[in-house]
Amino acid sequence: MNAVLSVQGASAPVKKKSFFSKFTRLNMLRLARAVIPAAVLMMFFPQLAMAAQGQDLMASGNTTVKATFGKDSSVVKWVVLAEVLVGAVMYMMTKNVKFLAGFAIISVFIAVGMAVVGL
């Protein structure tokens, strides 16, 4: 006959490491060793670090982007239509009003995002 012994009850608590345990002296030295060379290079070559005399390589595509995603483009209309359809279908499936009103919230986010970007 085989006997099986089992111990039941609370196990020993496992201590969770503190967030501040990452800020040890050794870790700070490692961080300094990684950051100081980059800081020295940026100090000696500031024009490379800040791209002061840089040329905008994407400027030629501004008209294409505005034509594709601008206020009067068909892409924005199709995205809004897809939002309305998905919101309606999700509302019919779940009967949750959040899905029905979600398209309005997403439309506001899209309008604000396009205004911020400049489209």
From Swiss-Prot:
The keyword Transmembrane helix applies. It holds the Pfam family TraA. The keyword Lipid biosynthesis does not apply. Belongs to the TraA family. The modification N-acetylalanine is found at A52. Its main location: membrane. This is Pilin. Residues 1-51 form a propeptide. It is a multi-pass membrane protein. Propilin is the precursor of the pilus subunit, pilin, that forms conjugative pili, the filamentous surface appendages required for cell-to-cell contact during the earlier stages of bacterial conjugation, and that retract after contact is established. Mature pilin is assembled with the help of TraQ and TraX. It is found in: Cell inner membrane; Secreted. InterPro entries: TraA. It comes from Escherichia coli. Monomer. Interacts with itself to form filaments; also interacts with TraQ. Keywords: Acetylation, Cell inner membrane, Cell membrane, Conjugation, Membrane, Plasmid, Secreted, Transmembrane, Transmembrane helix. The chain crosses the membrane at residues 74-94, 99-119. Residues 1-73 are periplasmic. Residues 95-98 are cytoplasmic. GO terms for cellular component: extracellular region; plasma membrane.
